[in-house]
């Protein structure tokens, strides 16, 4: 089976994440998208919900879609997980593993731990996070020519919604209706998440 890994903090997961994952299913060769919430995001320390809560919110968001799955691989690790470790783990289970990346991270991926190994061994699925398609395509061409890897750009509208904005609205006692799955909205209210 061909799967795509969708890693992220998902703090919280929102409708934009779900739409992006559905576009990956619609316009790539993958048969399943696996959401992989970060356990200990080293670059994000403030206002990050507990890993268990973030995992539960993803689970609630995707439970009615048989083509979406979730993994606690990174959450179960006691230390921050490197992307290469996650990709290698899933490669031992699945026939082909694709890595979903936002176009805003394309120029940064070369600085990641074991970047060359990632770029040589794993095909990328790029989701547009900005509207400048020419710049995105240039970056893809640069990486493709250097690493001779399969990089697919998913042509889709830019989803202009962010977890940061959702947390801000919650802290101001504003509605997040339609921005997250209704079960996630209910979970956030019940647990009192993201209140300052």
Swiss-Prot record:
Nucleotide-binding keyword on record: yes
Any one GO molecular function term: nicotinate-nucleotide adenylyltransferase activity
One Pfam family from the record: CTP_transf_like
Pathway assignment: Cofactor biosynthesis; NAD(+) biosynthesis; deamido-NAD(+) from nicotinate D-ribonucleotide: step 1/1
EC number, as in UniProt: 2.7.7.18
Catalytic activity: nicotinate beta-D-ribonucleotide + ATP + H(+) = deamido-NAD(+) + diphosphate
GO terms for biological process, alphabetical: NAD biosynthetic process
This protein's UniProt keywords: ATP-binding, NAD, Nucleotide-binding, Nucleotidyltransferase, Pyridine nucleotide biosynthesis, Transferase
Main enzyme class: transferase
Tagged with keyword Transferase: yes
Transmembrane annotation, as ranges: none
UniProt-listed PANTHER family: NICOTINATE-NUCLEOTIDE ADENYLYLTRANSFERASE-RELATED (PTHR39321), PHOSPHOPANTETHEINE ADENYLYLTRANSFERASE (PTHR39321:SF3)
Family (UniProt): Belongs to the NadD family.
Primary role: Catalyzes the reversible adenylation of nicotinate mononucleotide (NaMN) to nicotinic acid adenine dinucleotide (NaAD).
Protein's UniProt name: Probable nicotinate-nucleotide adenylyltransferase
The organism of origin for this protein: Caldicellulosiruptor bescii (strain ATCC BAA-1888 / DSM 6725 / KCTC 15123 / Z-1320) (Anaerocellum thermophilum)
